[in-house]
């Protein structure tokens, strides 16, 4: 029984580490759009550019004892900026990954300067 518990803990730890690896926005966004469109019907798939922008932004790590609010405010600054400035550059028919990615990067720069 103890061995089974240890195996489950090790596998869970490996899965958590795999999930924590960050995929660059430029790679995540087009794949997310394809998956979102395939899993949605009109008019729901019209939200895919926003959904994928939110999903592909680098989210902060889970809170720890040493974390502070700056990490979260930086993420929400990027999300707000990307939603306002970048989502409209993309559609299901024309993902415009290069422009959206550059726009999201500029949001990262703007938000980093503010914090």
Curated annotation (Swiss-Prot):
List locations, semicolon-separated: Secreted
Domain of life of the organism encoding this protein: Eukaryota
Major subcellular site: secreted
Which InterPro entries does the record cross-reference, listed alphabetically?
Answer: THNL
**Which terms are listed as keywords in the entry?**
Disulfide bond, Plant defense, Secreted, Signal
GO BP terms: namely: defense response
For this record, the Gene Ontology CC terms, alphabetical, are: extracellular region
Q: How is it modified after translation?
A: Is disulfide-linked.
- Signal sequence span is 1-20
Protein name (database record): Thionin-like protein 2
* Taxonomic source organism: Arabidopsis thaliana (Mouse-ear cress)
